[in-house]
């Protein structure tokens, strides 16, 4: 990693919070949560409501068009990047403008949508592609190769993740704010 060390507690990825008990939801609320981004589709949220829906730090930001409009391949999230630029830009805006504290990102399973957005965030923080792929592979049912292929696509097609995000409409000031939020610089 060249961007410094990731700030402990700056970013948490998880699966759906709909199964949290009331006590567990209160335990989450007692933490310094700045933003919870729920990346699920509206129909997923309707079927399994978030216990944080009414909290001021909660944002419902579906990361994918519904329907997606493409068949997702198993070995890359490249189509997710190519077909959801506006949604990805909105997620980055919500993170960049969040108050100080922890950002929690989740979808239904905490793998695909959450993993892809987390990878983009870590790339902005200048974490190496190998480290991002290894971090992604810690989630059961994921492949480091899929994330490696996704990051390679961002580099080949857009000239890197920062250029991809600029293409999406994310302002350079937002990228700098996210980098600052996520890292401890030496």
Q: What are the language-model segments listed below?
A:
Residues 1-104, 116-186:
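Cys-dependent protein tyrosine phosphatase-like superfamily
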Residues 109, 113-114:
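Ser/Thr-glycine-rich phosphate-binding loops at phosphate-binding pockets of nucleotides
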């Amino acid at each position: 990693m060249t961007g410094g060390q990731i700030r402990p507690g700056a970013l948490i990825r998880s699966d759906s919070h709909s199964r949290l008990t009331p006590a567990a939801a209160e335990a989450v609320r007692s933490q310094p949560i700045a933003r919870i981004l729920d990346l699920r589709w509206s129909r997923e949220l309707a079927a399994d409501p978030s216990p944080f829906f009414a909290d001021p730090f909660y944002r419902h930001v579906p990361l994918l068009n519904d329907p997606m409009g493409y068949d997702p391949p198993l070995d890359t999230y490249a189509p997710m990047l190519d077909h959801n630029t506006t949604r990805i830009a909105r997620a980055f805006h919500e993170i960049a403008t969040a108050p100080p504290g922890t950002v929690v990102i989740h979808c239904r399973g905490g793998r695909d949508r959450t993993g892809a957005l987390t990878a983009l965030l870590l790339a902005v923080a200048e974490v190496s592609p190998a480290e991002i792929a290894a971090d992604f592979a810690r989630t059961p049912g994921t492949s480091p190769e899929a994330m490696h292929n996704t990051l390679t696509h961002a580099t080949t097609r857009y000239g890197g993740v920062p250029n991809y995000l600029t293409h999406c409409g994310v302002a350079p000031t937002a990228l700098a704010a996210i980098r600052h939020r996520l890292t401890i610089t030496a």
